[in-house]
Structure formats: structure tokens, C-alpha cells
């Protein structure tokens, strides 16, 4: 077993997060390597490190850690245990979205994520065979709505002149969900850091002020009574071509 740590930084990262990643790797005890992205936009920062990790034939699991995560002690061992014991192909830890605040994962009643951030996510190497390249893309905005006890998932194609942030993680997770190999939700949560005050460069005593969010104030779920059809994709002919879902 070898862990490929994928850090999709666009140029900055909290030193505490790096410290926690190394702590977790040492505690887990498996072989590992870290793959970096520097000064690349979304989704390139995700695709670059994914390609690097998969190019190493010894890497068995890709651990995505975004640059602002708060990793509790034992999180890597805990999530790897869940992945192996349950035979999952991917597992994600929920964490608070600081601007809301709320959790970052929508899950079905069986614990599968159909809408998920990837701040702390482990993906088995074999899971990527269910997706076509590019594995990460941000040209689709997803709109979720409840319609007659169905979750309607409607894509909106992003035009070149539109301003959009993210969605690469949503498309990645939703593609796996529709393939029947969803990202499962870990029972252990992470936190998120945010820089609230930049240290004054004119004083040695002026350090950066960083706030940590660790409480999930809102659990996002979608449940129906005795209905196995938990998700329904809107009827768009070219949807598979646009999100690269393979049969």
C-alpha cells in the first residue's frame, strides 16, 4: 500500500495543514509521497496532481487534502479503515463550509455522497477506471431540486465569459454516484481554516490570525420513504458526454 497525497493548492497553504498531513502519514505507517500543484487554476490544480499520483504505479490510494483543512488526529487511519473494511472505492470527510456555515456534503439515506466537497477525500486507484479524463472539470454548474420525492439534478453549462468558482468536486462525486460507485461519507469530520487578519509587515509582532471552524451546524441529507430511486438525472441527451460518465 502506498498513499499518494494530492494537495491541489493554487499557490498558498496553511503550515498547520502540512504539519497535520505529515503527522497523519507517520501515524498510519504506510509508504507515501506528496504531489503538489503550484499556481494553477481550478480544475488544473486537481488534474495535475491526479495525473502525477497515477503515474506512480505503486500508489494504491489518492488522498486529496485541500490547503485549508483542519485534520483531527487519526483521521487518515480512520478513513482508510472505513474504506478497506466496507469495500468502498472512495470516502470523504465532511467539514464546515465557513461562509454558510454548514456541512459540505449532501448524502442519501445510505451514506453515499451525491454532492460533496473534496477537502479530505481518499480515492482508491481502481475507482478512476469508472471515469474518463479529465477527471476534474469545472464547466458544469449543478442545480439540485426536490421534485415529487425525487432529487432532480440539473446541469447548467458554464460559458467562457461566466464567472464560476469550484464545481470540480461536485462533478467528480456526482459522476461516481451515477456510476454506482459513490463517494461514501466518513463518520469522522474535519475542520476548515480561514485567514481573518494578515500580519502587518512593518512589525515583528504582527502575525497572521487564523480561525478554525470545526462544528457542523447543518447536516445536509435527502431522504425518501421506502423509495429506492434516490436520484433522478434530468433528461438531457448529451449529459454523459459533458460529464464523462462511462457505461
Regions found by a protein language model. Give the residues of each.
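A short, glycine-/small-residue-rich helix N-cap motif at loop->alpha-helix starts
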Residues: 40-45, 165-166
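Short beta-strand-to-loop acidic/aromatic patch adjacent to the donor-nucleotide binding site
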Residues: 59-70
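Active-site nucleotide-sugar/metal-binding loop of Leloir-type enzymes
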Residues: 47-61
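Conserved catalytic core of nucleotide-sugar-dependent glycosyltransferases
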Residues: 72-152
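Short, high-confidence coil segments that cap the C-terminus of an alpha-helix
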Residues: 58-59, 86-88, 181
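C-terminal catalytic/acceptor-binding lobe
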Residues: 136-247
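N-proximal low-complexity "stem/linker" segments adjacent to membrane-targeting elements
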Residues: 1-36
Amino acid at each position: 500500500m502506498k498513499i499518494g497525497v494530492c494537495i491541489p493548492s493554487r499557490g498558498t497553504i496553511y503550515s498547520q495543514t502540512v504539519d497535520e498531513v505529515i503527522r497523519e502519514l507517520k501515524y498510519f505507517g504506510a509508504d507515501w509521497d506528496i504531489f503538489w500543484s503550484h499556481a494553477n487554476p481550478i480544475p488544473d490544480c486537481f488534474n495535475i496532481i491526479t495525473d502525477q499520483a497515477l503515474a506512480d504505479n505503486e500508489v494504491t490510494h489518492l488522498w486529496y487534502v485541500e490547503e485549508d483543512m483542519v485534520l483531527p488526529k487519526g483521521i487518515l487511519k480512520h478513513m482508510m479503515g472505513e474504506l478497506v473494511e466496507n469495500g468502498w472505492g472512495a470516502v470523504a470527510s465532511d467539514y464546515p463550509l465557513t461562509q454558510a456555515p454548514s456541512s459540505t456534503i449532501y448524502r442519501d439515506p445510505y451514506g453515499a455522497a451525491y454532492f460533496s466537497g473534496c477537502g479530505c477525500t481518499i480515492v482508491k486507484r481502481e475507482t478512476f477506471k469508472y471515469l474518463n479524463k479529465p477527471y476534474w472539470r469545472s464547466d458544469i454548474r449543478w442545480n439540485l431540486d426536490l421534485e415529487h420525492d425525487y432529487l432532480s439534478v440539473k446541469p447548467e453549462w458554464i460559458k467562457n465569459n461566466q464567472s464560476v468558482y469550484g464545481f470540480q468536486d461536485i462533478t467528480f462525486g456526482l459522476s461516481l454516484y451515477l456510476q454506482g460507485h459513490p463517494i461514501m461519507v466518513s463518520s469522522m469530520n474535519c475542520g476548515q481554516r480561514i485567514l481573518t487578519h494578515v500580519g502587518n509587515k512593518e512589525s515583528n509582532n504582527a502575525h497572521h490570525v487564523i480561525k478554525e471552524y470545526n462544528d457542523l451546524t447543518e447536516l445536509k441529507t435527502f431522504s425518501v420513504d421506502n423509495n429506492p430511486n434516490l436520484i433522478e438525472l434530468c433528461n438531457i441527451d448529451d449529459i454523459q458526454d459533458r460529464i464523462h460518465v462511462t457505461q
